[in-house]
Amino acid sequence: MNLVIPEGYQSALDIRETEVAIKMVKDFFEKALAANLNLTRVSAPLFVSPESGLNDNLNGVERPVDFDILEQNGRVAEIVHSLAKWKRHALGRYGFSHGEGLYTDMNAIRRDEETDNVHSLFVDQWDWERIIDKDERNTDTLKDIVSKVYQALQETEDYMAMKYNYIEKSLPQQLTFVTTQELEDQYPDKTPKEREYEAVKEHGAIFLMQIGDKLASGEPHDGRAPDYDDWSLNGDIIVYYPVLDMAFEISSMGIRVDEKALKEQLVKAGCPERENLPFQKEILEKKLPYTIGGGIGQSRICMFFLKKAHIGEVQASIWPEAVLEEAEKKGLNIL
């Protein structure tokens, strides 16, 4: 059973108060993010066709939930894992220009997820994407956009701390930028997750860059699909979360692959045949805009700002019976 309940933990809010606070966090952050990044909200699909190549393959092993469509002679559709590829496609189709972007409320089901305090079968996030020029595909652009996302997080923390006196601010003024290789060099004997913990304990909040490619040790820091992020220009916003004494990932984002990076990464990932899928083909033929984008966990930031011990306190999902029994014993209000 993957459940940790901190000694003496008690939620400051009951279920109804929590629901009100969740809405407050989501409404404020969504507006701040859209303003800081110049984003327009758009509607998004819950499912896509497998042959479109638009679903997010995550680490390449997770099985999507699929179903057949009666009206279309049993044609199969897949519930999205994320909208990483769909968004880039939509930016081109909807007529967005340089410096403009979109965001959407993304709901997904990850049936193969190992659930714990911060992982659920149900994923809800703001998925966003913004158009850049090819010559902006560099670390400076990445850092600039990351800082704007972090600013929206800081503004939300200020707002929630003003509304609820039990909320103590914990985000540092400055976000620290560090690469996965720098962390491996600094902590060669630790696992990737242990390195993240050491870094956030020291800095409070980091943007961990360059995730997906092999490090000097021969192992990648973590898996990333080869056909959306450029592994040399991506990363995660990770913060220290005192309630659970852990490294807490809030957002994964990056500059997206161009035609060169896509070809290289498909070969590295051992799936060069994916370049024949429609979405990947459009990148190789330079038919899609160059973009930067990411996902920001809605339940994750609600957990963080409301100081909750379990993600089930801020979203409705299905949990193992043993987890529900233990949570009830310890007074956790699972939705």
Question: Language-model segments: which ranges?
Answer:
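Generic recognition of stable, solvent-exposed alpha-helical segments in well-folded globular domains
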Residues: V20, M24, F28, R137-D144, ...
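Generic structural hydrophobic/aromatic packing signal, biased to beta-strands
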Residues: I22-V25, F29-L33, F67, I79, ...
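A generic secondary-structure signal for well-formed alpha-helical elements
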Residues: L33-T40, V149-M160, A309
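N-terminal pre-domains immediately preceding structured catalytic cores
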Residues: S49-D56, K169-V178, P320
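Extended, charged alpha-beta segments that form solvent-exposed binding/catalytic grooves
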Residues: G99, T104-E194
